[in-house]
Amino acid sequence: LTHSLTVSSIARSMGKKIGLYLEEKPEENFGRKQTEQLQALLQTVGLVHDLGNPPFGHYGEAVIGNWFSKWFLEDGSAYASSLTDQQIEEFKHYDGNVQNLRIVSKLQTMNDRYGANFTYGTMACLIKYPWNVLDSSASKGKYGYFESEADLIRNIYSKTGICDHVRHPATFIMEAADDITYIGDDIEDGAKKGYIPWEQAYRELRKKFSLTHSELFKSCDEYEQKIKSDLEPADKLAAKVRYFRNVVQGYLIQLAVDTFKKDYGNIMTGKRPAKQDLLSSDEAFVEALKGITHEYCFSCREVLALEVVGHHVISGLLDTFVPALVSTDADFSSPKSYVGKLYYLISSNFKYIAKQNYSEDDSSIKSIKKVEDFTLHDKLRLIVDFISGMTDSYAMGLYQELTGIKLHYH
């Protein structure tokens, strides 16, 4: 949540800078009202952009995808004929960004089929990669929507005027805000926890980029001279790293805004590739910043241990729920049966949504599915919706209960 709040704040500030720039261009017919709307749009998508992340974050995504890749080759091979190629690939390449759209459009249900009732523009801004998993553009498993949301995508394109394979312009801004936030915050967190040998890392970075980024390093060096000498070493380090984060984030924000301005024509006409982010014009520096955390933080004991735990928890939950619920003779009707017990453990809101069968032309419910009529895809999607919506602690607690490691008696 702290990360999302920061992304939301940075995205909003970038929206203001770009909006004020466009206000000065009469041909754009962009006024103060539009600037405020752009800010509100970016603030919203920044806040919800990570809702689809499963337990244990990006590593959790990989665990889900790897589990299904193995399952479809082994026990699940007998069921593969019941799914489309697209559905199979979606499970094998689970992506939290894609789940995000499903959450806000369906899973956060109220009284109709529209989920959180976001505008089409807001949902369009959440689609980082505007193509499906089978598209030739979906390299490295990067895609934007599930087959189950294909009708929604067509409506988004129709209502917003966005063409297939074209990003919403504000998506570039939101993505940059996300990158800027985690680049700065990861370095600060890593240095404070002692994983990053800050003095060494800073010297190496300054040596490599002192000519191209002289003002940035000059500002940091001058600030270091102003730090009170009576501060404890840990406090001095924290102050230096915090200032570095602020300076770097400020630089990257302006870099992204300037890139958006320079390439405004291509962005608005859909000619700028969706995979070309707003920080790519200073790729060497950005990659060097990311490299600091990759080198020192991603292999630290705390991270590795958490990932091992995440692997056991998520794999264990999938091992439990999938074989039981996909069985053709599964009895869902009673909590007295083993499968029934597992089914009743799934959150009621996910089961409610899985049962709805909406009319194609409006939001009315055409019929209610019986559990016995669930397709294989319905069952797998229900399980993934349930598990991916858990927090780390909830997933671990449920795993411990189901394996008998830790029981809660009432």
Where do the PLM segments sit?
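Polyanionic (Asp/Glu-rich) segments that form extended negatively charged tracts
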Residues: 189, 205, 213-273, 325, ...
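Sequence-structural signature of the catalytic-core scaffold of metal-dependent phosphohydrolases
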Residues: 2-10, 14-44, 51-244, 253
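Substrate-recognition/cap regions that form aromatic- and gly/pro-loop-enriched pockets
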Residues: 261-361
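Charged, amphipathic alpha-helical oligomerization/scaffolding segments
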Residues: 6, 176-179, 248, 252-255, ...
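C-terminal amphipathic alpha-helical interaction region
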Residues: 336-401, 405
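Non-transmembrane, amphipathic alpha-helical segments
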Residues: 17, 165-172, 237-248, 277, ...
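Short, charged/polar, low-complexity loop and linker segments
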Residues: 156-161, 233, 289-297, 366-375
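Zn2+-dependent metallopeptidase catalytic domains
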Residues: 113, 239, 333, 399-410
